[in-house]
Amino acid sequence: MNSKIRHIHMVGIGGAGMSGIAEVLLNLKYEISGSDMSDSAVVRHLRSLGARIAVGHAAENVGDVQVLVKSTAISDDNPELVEARKRNIAIIPRAEMLAELMRLRQGIAIAGTHGKTTTTSLTASIFDEAGLDPTVIIGGRLNVYGANAHLGHGEYLIAEADESDGSFLCLLPIINVVTNVDEDHLDHYKTREAINSAFVQFMNNVPFYGLNIVCGDDPGVLELLPQVKRPVLTYGFAEDNALRAVPLESGRISRFQVWLHDEKLGEVSLPQPGRHNILNALASIGAAMEVGISFEKCAAGLCGFKGVGRRFEFKGEKQGVTVVDDYGHHPAEIAATLATARQVFEGRRIVAAFQPHRFSRTEAHFGEFCKVFNNVDQLLLTEIYAASENPIPGVSGQSLAQGIRQVSSTPVEYFQTLDDLARALPDILQEGDVLLTLGAGNITRLGPTWLEGLDHA
């Protein structure tokens, strides 16, 4: 950005993607203001770095700014966007600002319907281990930084590429990772064909000397490869992948061999459970080795990984009950998390507390949601977290509970509010249980609420 840009206003600044960009911009000494609907811990953290943030959206929040950056959740009739248009202030999506930051570095973009945040975090851990001090922008709290962004002094920028509204096509990285391609965000794309088209364009956006590192085990990815005109490296468990993992041990630690073509590179001990996390680690190894990082540094970076918030995160234990929190909100993500829970907590009763996220997603995947909880011992269901969407007639937490009862033998209880669920927990949980909270909304409050003995979330 040139010297004309001094003051940047960010609408929806507390969101997972926006807050990381805001933190990097603050560290680059830009003047940052913004607004959000809630006074969250993220908002308070940004204020501590110097941002001026209003709670609630209003025209008067837009001061003497040169550009307004908007979150994907912000509608065109937002009063701050209306005010900016009146004053001919440039309005750009968050991905365009991320692209501007990436223009100053060698970009590595991590895309895919599931697994982006963890894969981005694992990649950052390896680059840190190699002494490359990357700039990192992710959609979750990376424990080693205590934040979801880090301004490094090295030449690389590692970023989570959000496909939800197609704006990830603004990015021009030298390396792309695609973890999977699934049917999601139909509120924007409308059809699976449109999703596929966006990912093909994303992969073809790398330069001729760049590389796409893609999961060769994912049918959605494989379907697109004939249309990709740029170099590709596949990874996965299947033997026809160029970069391959052979699992050796599962549990709270995943130990596996790594092969590149016919050469055994060595072994990795990853302090994260689940086959999906082995795949995420393989992708990060592929990205790291492409820029010249040795396998030994890759293995060390993965072994020392400190985790990322809300990704199978152990929150604590009380009265013999273990509490785990996970961001999973799509049926495929939930299935992977539940399989991991069964693997890690073999023989224990799994009590899943799920808060559906968005009316459109619940409607689009209603049948899958009804079946995905078949292997939990008890399901506690709350009302849908709207995430700024308007309700859809006939789509609710209660209708989902009814649908699950029709096709599954899993006991399910519905709670209108999170507080109702919090008050019921002491009568539901038993010694030896695992309470697994699932969803992208405020369900994350439930575990700490119970651990602290509170009756409201």
Curated annotation (Swiss-Prot):
Keyword Ligase set for record: yes
EC number(s) on file: 6.3.2.8
Record field: catalytic activity: UDP-N-acetyl-alpha-D-muramate + L-alanine + ATP = UDP-N-acetyl-alpha-D-muramoyl-L-alanine + ADP + phosphate + H(+)
Protein name: UDP-N-acetylmuramate--L-alanine ligase
Pathway: Cell wall biogenesis; peptidoglycan biosynthesis
GO cellular component, one term: cytoplasm
Record key words, sorted: ATP-binding, Cell cycle, Cell division, Cell shape, Cell wall biogenesis/degradation, Cytoplasm, Ligase, Nucleotide-binding, Peptidoglycan synthesis
Native source organism of the sequence: Desulfovibrio desulfuricans (strain ATCC 27774 / DSM 6949 / MB)
Main location: cytoplasm
Family of this protein: Belongs to the MurCDEF family.
